[in-house]
Each structure stands twice: as C-alpha cells, then as structure tokens.
Amino acid sequence: MKIKVKLPDGKEKEYDRGITPAEIAKELGVKKAIGAVVNGELWDLKRPIENDCELRLVTLEDPEAPEFYRHTMAHILAQAVMRIYGKENVKLGIGPTIENGFYYDFDIKNGRLTEEDLPKIEQEMKKIIKENLPIERKEISKEEARKLFNNQPYKLELIEEIEGDRVTIYRQGEFVDLCRGPHLPSTGIVKHFKLLSVSGAYWRGSEKNPMLTRVYGTAFAKKEDLDNYLKFLEEAQRRDHRKLGPHLELFMLNTEYAPGMPFFLPKGVVVLNELMKFSRELHRERGYQEIFTPLIMNEQLWKISGHWDHYAENMYFIEKDEERYAVKPMNCPGHILVYKSRTVSYRDLPLRFFEFGRVHRYERSGVLHGLMRVRSFTQDDAHIFCTPGQIEEEILGVLDLINTIYSQFGFTYRVELSTMPEDHMGDEAIWEKATTALKNALERAGLSYKVNEGEGAFYGPKIDFHIRDSIGREWQCATIQLDFMMPEKFNVTYIGPDNKEHRAVMIHRAIYGSLERFFGILIEHFAGAFPTWLAPIQVAVIPISEKHNDGAEKIAKRISQEGFRVFFDNRRETLGYRIRQAQTQKIPYMIILGDKELESGKISVRTRTGKEIKDVDLEHFVETLRNEVLSRKLELLMEG
C-alpha cells in the first residue's frame, strides 16, 4: 500500500507504507537528519510512517533538535546512574526535557545523590556517548511492559495511567525506559552536555509521595553554545534575588513559620513604596480611582464567582460564628461589589478601579521559589467597567500605561494575543467583536504581536506581555483580560440611553502582576544596583576619620533635608572597609570627606562603579541628584 508524503517545498511523493524518515532522508541526500516532524508531531528517524502526511526532516540546526538530543541525554543520564549504583538499587521516575535542558528523577536505595557525585556520572555518560549505542523504539503491550518494569514501581504506576493497551519503550544497550520520545538515532550524536545541580522532588509533585533525587542537566549541539549557556548561568546565579535580597537586606524568608510569605525589611519596603508611588502617579493621571477591598469575605461571594467550585484547593478558609469565610485569592469579586454599590449610568463609564490588593493562594511547598512563586502577594490589580463600544479605547490606554511603566525600567517586551477556545462561554459575535477591538488597539499602538489561536480563557480573550531582562530572560508579567463571565455571574449592568439595563464589559489588568515577583525580577535585572530613585540608600556620607565627623554630619543632614535617603557612615572602621561596604550594598553615590573637602567646601563623589569626581560643589551635587531622582533616570548622572 502506498502513502503520500508532502515535503516542505510543496512536492508530494509516493512511498510504501511503513517507510521511515531515515529512508526518505537518504533518498533526498539529507545526511545530517536526526529526526522529523510528521503532521506537526516530532518523529524518530527510524519510526515507520503509516499514513499520508506532511514531513519535514530535522537536523541539529533546526529549532526542534534540542527536544531530540536533550531527551536522549536524559536517558543517557539514567543509564549512567544505573551503571554506577546498580540496576537493582535505582528506581526510575521521569526524565523529560525542560527549557534549555533536561532532568531525571531517581529513587536510590541506601542514599541520595549529591552534587559531588555529578563528575563521576558525567564520566560514565561520556562512555555511553562514545559507545554510540543504537536507540530503538518499540511498541509493546501493557502486559509485556508490566513484566519488563516489574522492579520499577514508578514506571508501573505510569503504565496504568496510559490510555489504550499498548505503550512505547526505548532501548539503548542494556538500558530500557518507558517513553513517548522523540530520541536521536544513537547515543553518540551529541557530545556537549553538563550536569548542573541536584535537588529533591516529590514524586508527581505531591508531598504525600516519596521524595526523589532530581538531577538537572543541559546539552547543546555545539560546544560554543554550551560554553555560552554556562556563562549565562553563572551570571544568572550572580544575580539570583534569593541571594542578593537577604545580602542587601531587602527581604527575608522564614520557611518554618510562614512558608511562601516573604518578610520585607526596611530597605525592601523603601523599594516597594517607590514602585507603588510611581504606579499611583500614573494611574491618577489616567483617571483610575484607587480602592481597598477586604482581605477576607464570606463564602457566598466565592460561590457566586465560581472560585468555590474551581479554585477551592488553592484557597485559605476561616470559620467564625458558624460562618465560613475565604481569604481572597483574587481581587475581582471585591471590585464588582464596589461597582454594584450604586446604580451606574452609561454617562459614568468607563469606571476604572485600581488596588494594590494582597491575595493568598496555596502553592505546594515544592514549587515555592523566593519572591517568584509565593503564597502571599500583592497585585497591582485594576478592573475597567465599560460599554462594548469603549473596549478599544480602554485597551489602547492600558497599552500606553504598560509601555510607560516597562520603559521606565529599561524593559523590552513581546506581546501575545490569545483568542476564543472551543469551550468558550458567551456569544461568538461578542467574542469576535472583542477580539477585533484588542487587535485594533494593538495595531494602533504600533505593537507587533503573536496570535495564540484558541488559547484564551473560556471567559474572554487576553493579551499577555513577556518582558526581557538585562541578560535576555523572559518573564510573563502584564495581562489584559476581557471577562464575559463575571458580569454574567454578578449581573453587572449599567443604565443605557434607552433607560434600560445593559451588560457592562469588564476588563481585568495587572502590570507589575505580583509586586513581590516584579521586585524579584528587578533585583535580578539590575543585579541589585537599583537606579537612584529606587535605591534604598541613595547617598553614603563617609568621613575619612573621627575628626571629620561633625562636618560630614552637617553635609549628610543637608542632603537628607532635600528628601534623599542618606546613610552617615561614621563607624570606627577603616575608610577602605566603609567604601567597600557601600559598594557591596550597591549605594549609588558615596561622598568622601576629609580635611581638603571640609576646608574648601567642595566634596569628593565616588560612584558605586568606582568612578571618582573631585571638587564638586555640594549644591551642584544636590541639584544633579534631584534631577536624577525626579526624572527617574536609569543611569547615574554623575557618571555622565
């Protein structure tokens, strides 16, 4: 029987059913093929093709290649661990690819791996790569699989959850794994890898299950790419907010008494207040009204909103006076109650409510991560209530606000628009009109965007913003979400020109997203060296010796009186130590004062990067500092 295969150049060819991409690659002269994409699915090079399809061969240069070779590298890792520790002593978990790498989970009898074990595992992996073992894909019955993995309890659990009667296994040498693939044709194709770290991970992510040992690694087709990535990881580690935050006395975490709930220290609160002050100024200019809604509200509210049915496992509850209350996981129901507290006319719209609302959401302890993944956080939440005809202009206004805020921190960003899914609620005509309004606003704002067809929430289309930090990482922060569900559930209406009730449109939006998470991103973006307007301490005044203390203190007070955050460092430490301390604390400016400065009335200024500016008039410095802070400059003006 023949099948038709359509190639990327549009040509169709007929082949015998069961032909493999490897045979097609040989015919086409593509010697470097490592796999294929068949009807959009990643496909092993030696896997037979049974039906008509579109086919594109994959080489190591293609964007799909890492999925093949990193998946194979995860199997090489597992094979190496079983060789070293003994097949009978190692129970295998799962070993998927992840962004920029892979991992494998192990349950090892009589002990756990540590990072000290990684070099010997790498050496064994190199041997397996050198052996260049052929990798064979095979479909077997579940009964055969149960016998094959009879000493692998985690694999047996996975087998029972797979639909159908057959499963896929992969074999390389003596190693066999339950796996969907895809994989390389053999173990020797990609040689450039590095094992990165070891951590604990509960089986299936549940604290009720055994703790396994997770080994992370990465792999690249080219050594140069691997080396560059390892340098990137070093830089990311240097910027890690979990290290910098406590070092700079910005925040602390207490996993014993408040897991996932950060404590912000005085210096951190300064930064948070500056972020909120900046945001409030912009919101006031744009006609937003700030409100504050209760942290705890009756269960009936959450039943109406749907959170009770669909989100209860992520919520915290309180029972008092035979009434049940929930700590709010979201701000929107509270904003709706404010809207509904009076009759709203079409003349009142749009109404823009804004809140720095503290919310609580339960997250498993295993996924908590510094400020990035927490259980208690503050959202810069706003809800816009408007008529259908006002959607486009309101979205345009939000886009401008987002751009203004992100530009202030030096962020670039990319935009994604997610449209109506199959399981949507509401009339399709309303969806189409709303989606068109979002597209028009994006185009009027001059923003390029990617469309994710059918990936919107069931209650409305949305726009997501992914900001890029100073080392190129992306973070999803701002969201603009149209909501057709909440106005229905809460009967959110306005009185129209016809004196009748009409359904209002509700737009959710957040820009920082989580204030805590945004703070963490900023710490890493600036490597702790905040621009002066954000810096917890803006100026350190350092007398050279005790005899200069009085004069230095007067200068410190003069600068402080102008509203700047000043640290007068007259500690009985060496001058060099105090300067180094100011630099490690990332203080933008240091004023060094000795005999010469106090006699001349001129100051010596040193920036945190080490640049020295001598004979500076104090009033000139104050004025420069004022301009730098008021205009929220990213750079230090005294370095210009």
From Swiss-Prot:
Family under the similarity heading: Belongs to the class-II aminoacyl-tRNA synthetase family.
Upper lineage: Bacteria, Thermotogati, Thermotogota, Thermotogae, Thermotogales
Quaternary structure, from the entry: Homodimer.
MF terms in GO: ATP binding; metal ion binding; threonine-tRNA ligase activity; tRNA binding
Cofactor field: Zn(2+)
Record's protein name: Threonine--tRNA ligase
HAMAP family in the record: Thr_tRNA_synth (MF_00184)
Catalytic reaction list: tRNA(Thr) + L-threonine + ATP = L-threonyl-tRNA(Thr) + AMP + diphosphate + H(+)
Locations listed in the record: Cytoplasm
